[in-house]
Amino acid sequence: MANLKAIRDRIQSVKNTKKITEAMRLVAAARVRRAQEQVLATRPFADRLAQVLYGLQSRLRFEEANLPLLRKREVKSVGLLVISGDRGLCGGYNNNVIRRAENRAKEIKAEGLNYQFVLVGRKSTQYFQRRDQPIDATYSGLEQIPTAAEANQIADQLLSLFLSEEVDRIELIYTRFLSLVSSRPVVQTLLPLDPQGLEAADDEIFRLTTRGGKFEVEREKVASQVRPLAPDMIFEQDPVQILDSLLPLYLSNQLLRALQESAASELAARMTAMSNASENAGELINTLTLSYNKARQAAITQELLEVVGGAEALT
């Protein structure tokens, strides 16, 4: 009977755990939808900003503007902006981006260059602090759905590093969102800005949907809505001054998109991890229930044999 009670308690414990993992999966799904809505909400601003930059690019040659954020110089030190999460229970999301950042740092060191980290997320901060890596700034406790204010704060720190010439190049390492079951850590150069990278480009929107009772992600290519500025438009200020003012805003917008992609990747990884945990819990419950029924049947059979044996002894 003691064995039966232990199995019964274990079944109840696993059922309680399954309720928790299922709730976490649904919460992550709701937040993925919120992230999706935020991406759509920020598109008009991004399109208008791209329109102005595109128009300025058509009126002057960026190479002749000689702006600090476009100026390439000899690279002696590299800043690495790494975006990770604050929490675990999201599969290999944090480990993958941290490993990519660590490998990139080794590559930079092998080239004879210095590097320092700007870390977003508690997981990457804890990892690199324990290994005494050079860290310029850390950010944690950000909103589950990234905000423009957070992107601006990080962008200000990066601009300070670059313009003070503490670093000569800044690279961004984040997780690109591909699907609910797939994401990929990527590395891209943030500063100095590439004039060719300011051109209007098509975008991609993701939507969380349900099909057959399961969550799925639909991706849609969206043509850029950017149109050239009117040829007779007159700028009150010098176009170079306008461009100099808009480039930091463009950088913040790029950071916001990277934060959004990383957040969506983390939430999708958590959804997948919790879904797998729920399925494993269900299988474990079935196995334990089968074991419980077998043990109970064996106990009943043993009691019957004892009763029959006792009755035969009395006759």
From Swiss-Prot:
It holds the Pfam family ATP-synt. The keyword Ion transport applies. GO terms for molecular function: ATP binding; proton-transporting ATP synthase activity, rotational mechanism. It comes from the Bacteria. Produces ATP from ADP in the presence of a proton gradient across the membrane. The gamma chain is believed to be important in regulating ATPase activity and the flow of protons through the CF(0) complex. SUPFAM superfamilies: ATP synthase (F1-ATPase), gamma subunit. It is found in: Cellular thylakoid membrane. Keywords: ATP synthesis, CF(1), Hydrogen ion transport, Ion transport, Membrane, Thylakoid, Transport. It is a peripheral membrane protein. Coiled coil: none annotated. It comes from Nostoc punctiforme (strain ATCC 29133 / PCC 73102). Belongs to the ATPase gamma chain family. The keyword Thylakoid applies. Gene3D superfamilies: 3.40.1380.10, ATP synthase, gamma subunit, helix hairpin domain. Transmembrane segments: none annotated. This is ATP synthase gamma chain. GO terms for cellular component: plasma membrane-derived thylakoid membrane; proton-transporting ATP synthase complex. F-type ATPases have 2 components, CF(1) - the catalytic core - and CF(0) - the membrane proton channel. CF(1) has five subunits: alpha(3), beta(3), gamma(1), delta(1), epsilon(1). CF(0) has three main subunits: a, b and c.
